[in-house]
């Protein structure tokens, strides 16, 4: 069986990607942090597409929570690995820089940029050992050109874009 993890998979883009991967025959691991009902709805939609999945609730900004959830999954699936990772989790807390709080800045970067790092780093070793993996990072035009009121979001998405380019150079020869 082929497994795909979609962070922020309970709604919006994450839900749409989960459904598309389900159509492609993947077992979908739907990550989310807070909205149980929406995660259940995404799981139902995945099943309606003829595939299956499971809900994987963890805080993508907490390395210990990520490790616990993914290690638990791995111990229940010792002969399997997650071959597709969709880093989709992210939030916007728009505000002009002049009035932006440190919390608004840090929360956006923590979820979008640090979450990408923590989850990707955890899954990367198995992809490299198996010599196959796909990592798709959902970003925004805001990460390329910046948008007023989105200094935090632009910085986070721009960071993911740059990290994606660097990571590709590190792992492409290993078919990841």
Tell where the protein language model's regions lie, with residue ranges:
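Active-site helix of classical SDR
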Residues: 120, 156, 164
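Alpha-helical segment proximal to the catalytic Tyr-Lys
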Residues: 125, 169-173
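Residue(s) in the substrate-gating loop at a strand-loop-helix junction
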Residues: 140
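Substrate-binding pocket helix/loop in short-chain dehydrogenase/reductase
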Residues: 82, 96-97, 104-109, 135
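The beta1-alpha1 cofactor-binding region of Rossmann-like NAD(H)/NADP(H)-dependent oxidoreductases
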Residues: 36, 57-69, 102
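Active-site loop immediately N-terminal to the catalytic Tyr-X3-Lys motif
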Residues: 98, 145-151, 173-174
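Conserved glycine-rich cofactor-binding loop
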Residues: 10-12
């Amino acid at each position: 069986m082929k497994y795909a993890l979609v962070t922020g998979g309970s709604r919006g883009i994450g839900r749409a990607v989960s459904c598309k991967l389900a159509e492609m025959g993947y077992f979908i691991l739907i990550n989310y942090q807070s909205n149980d009902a929406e995660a259940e709805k995404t799981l139902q939609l995945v099943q309606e597409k003829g595939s299956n999945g499971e809900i994987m609730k963890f805080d993508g900004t907490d390395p210990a929570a990520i490790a616990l959830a993914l290690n638990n999954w791995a111990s229940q699936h010792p002969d399997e690995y997650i071959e597709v990772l969709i880093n989709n989790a992210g939030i916007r807390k728009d505000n002009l820089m002049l009035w932006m709080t440190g919390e608004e800045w840090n929360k956006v970067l923590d979820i979008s940029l640090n979450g990408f790092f923590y989850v990707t780093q955890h899954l990367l070793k198995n992809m490299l050992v198996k010599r196959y993996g796909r990592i798709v990072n959902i970003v925004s035009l805001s990460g390329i050109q910046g948008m007023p009121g989105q200094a935090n979001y632009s910085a986070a998405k721009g960071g993911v874009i740059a990290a994606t380019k660097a990571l590709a150079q590190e792992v492409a020869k290993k078919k990841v």
